[in-house]
């Protein structure tokens, strides 16, 4: 039987450990299992985070094994290799698909009935791999997608417009990567279209500002990696937000990456678009209105993903 308040994280690198810490702060689980090929690393992270429990929410966190996951409601997969200098994206895909081919069967043979949340990159490709390797229904396997990119987008817009980030409604969709796109046509603050709100705040050269903000969002990961070596806090908070919507059955709309079956004219790949996320998983993909230019950019993003996916299929 699934224990809705129990979760596991597979992979205790920067992202996995930061996600565990973020989940402790959220207080939505009573039990969290950390699994890593390096058992001592998982033990160390569990100890370090547990020592802060008196100042946070009560949550049992420990290093475990695949035998501990059968009753989890959620498994978060952050395990994967990082891209090395001179390595192509396809090289990275092949390495991480191989890692997933060792991880996913360990999950399925334990009778796991919960949700798989893929966070490892390239997340769109690896979500598709996890779906195919596991054989689970598509609702139960999805990825963090552009949830972080969307948070970056809203944050930067809020800074530019001097308004609370929670009052900014805007999405980044498509690939979690260079071909992602901003949905400007639907962006708004309190129902006021973003262009109109810019003028309300005294920004009349807003097209130039909007392009700069989009490029900053798209290139944020590169910039952060150049400055500090890796990104992990932001994505950890995105993971916790997704987990919260699952556990609390919020039906929150989040731009996760999941299998397309005709939506937006796409199928046979995973890509990020606004989706209702609940205890059922990626319950419903929403087809939001897009401008003609945005539709073209989404199709272009999907085409790039499909090309990589097709080259990777022999490894799945």
Residue ranges with predicted function:
Residues 155-266, 274-275:
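Mobile gating loops/cap/lid regions near enzyme active sites that modulate substrate access
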Residues 12-13:
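Glycine-rich Rossmann-fold phosphate-binding loop(s) that bind the pyrophosphate
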Residues 88-154:
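Rossmann-like NAD(P)(H) cofactor-binding subdomain of soluble oxidoreductases
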Residues 314-316:
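Conserved small/polar residues in nucleotide/adenosyl-binding loops
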Residues 23:
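Aromatic pocket-lining residues of Rossmann-like dinucleotide-binding sites
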Residues 31, 35-73, 87, 306-311:
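Conserved N-terminal Rossmann-fold NAD(P) cofactor-binding segment
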Residues 16-17:
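N-terminal Rossmann-fold NAD(P) dinucleotide-binding loop
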């Amino acid at each position: 039987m699934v224990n809705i308040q129990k979760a596991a994280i597979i992979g205790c690198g920067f992202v996995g450990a930061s996600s565990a810490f973020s989940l402790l702060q959220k207080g939505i689980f009573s039990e969290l299992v950390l699994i890593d090929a390096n058992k001592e690393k998982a033990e160390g992270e569990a100890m370090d985070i547990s020592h802060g429990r008196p100042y946070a929410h009560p949550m049992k966190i420990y290093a475990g094994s695949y035998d501990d996951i059968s009753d989890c409601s959620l498994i978060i997969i952050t395990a994967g290799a990082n891209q090395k200098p001179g390595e192509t994206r396809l090289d990275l895909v092949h390495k991480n698909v191989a890692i997933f081919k060792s991880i996913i069967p360990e999950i399925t043979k334990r009778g796991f009935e919960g949700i798989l949340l893929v966070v490892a990159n390239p997340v769109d490709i690896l979500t598709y791999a996890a779906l195919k390797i596991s054989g689970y229904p598509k609702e139960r396997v999805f990825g963090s997608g552009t949830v972080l990119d969307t948070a970056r987008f809203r944050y930067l817009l809020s800074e530019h417009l001097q308004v609370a980030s929670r009052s900014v409604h805007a999405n980044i969709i498509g690939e979690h990567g260079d071909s992602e796109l901003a949905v400007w046509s639907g962006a708004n603050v309190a129902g006021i279209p973003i262009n109109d709100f810019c003028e309300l705040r005294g920004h009349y050269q807003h097209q130039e500002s909007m392009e700069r903000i989009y490029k900053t969002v798209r290139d944020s990961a590169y910039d952060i990696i150049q400055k500090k070596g890796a990104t992990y806090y932001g994505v950890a908070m995105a993971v916790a937000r997704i987990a919260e919507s699952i556990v609390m059955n919020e039906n929150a709309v989040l731009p996760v990456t999941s299998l397309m079956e005709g939506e937006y004219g796409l199928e046979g790949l995973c890509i990020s678009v606004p989706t209702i996320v609940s205890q059922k998983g990626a319950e419903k993909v929403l087809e939001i209105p897009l401008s003609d230019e945005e539709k073209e950019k989404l199709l272009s993003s999907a085409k790039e993903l499909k090309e990589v996916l097709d080259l990777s299929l022999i490894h799945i």
